[in-house]
């Protein structure tokens, strides 16, 4: 494989592509340029979710970093498959465990992972594929809306509101923006992790359909 540089471009319409928990879940922005931001962590999460949904039960396409995963348990799978004691990780066990994890987990051989845990140590993997933050082409304006819910959570809330049973909330969206992120694939690291041409095609498919299964009230168009 040769080195690949690529761009991921997507647009956002009346959606919040990546809320900032430090700012009340408002869309992330660069405080100097006021351009919208989507973190690389957010983009990788969507790629992982797509692979997990579309490659379920396909050998070699398991996902290491997934919701509610217990990472030690995932690494114990490697030790058990190789006949090692997870409580006695040595250099031999670590190196063999790292290769097993790369072979079986798509996101490890793609993005890398730190697996240097005390138990079932599988070392570290530097991934061949790296993504930048996505940044909007122009500065964005965050629209804020007040929303109401015609119900309350507890009887006490109902009593406090004298039966009105309404709760208020806020919702933030980006009216419209085009975002772009830069990425690269390092062929030398790909050789080390076993990242293949087929893996690259799978990654491209995931990026093309990044938001297909990501629609929600905050992202009605999936973006």
Language-model segment annotations:
Residues 1-223:
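RNA-binding basic/glycine-rich loop and surface signature characteristic of RAMP-family CRISPR effectors
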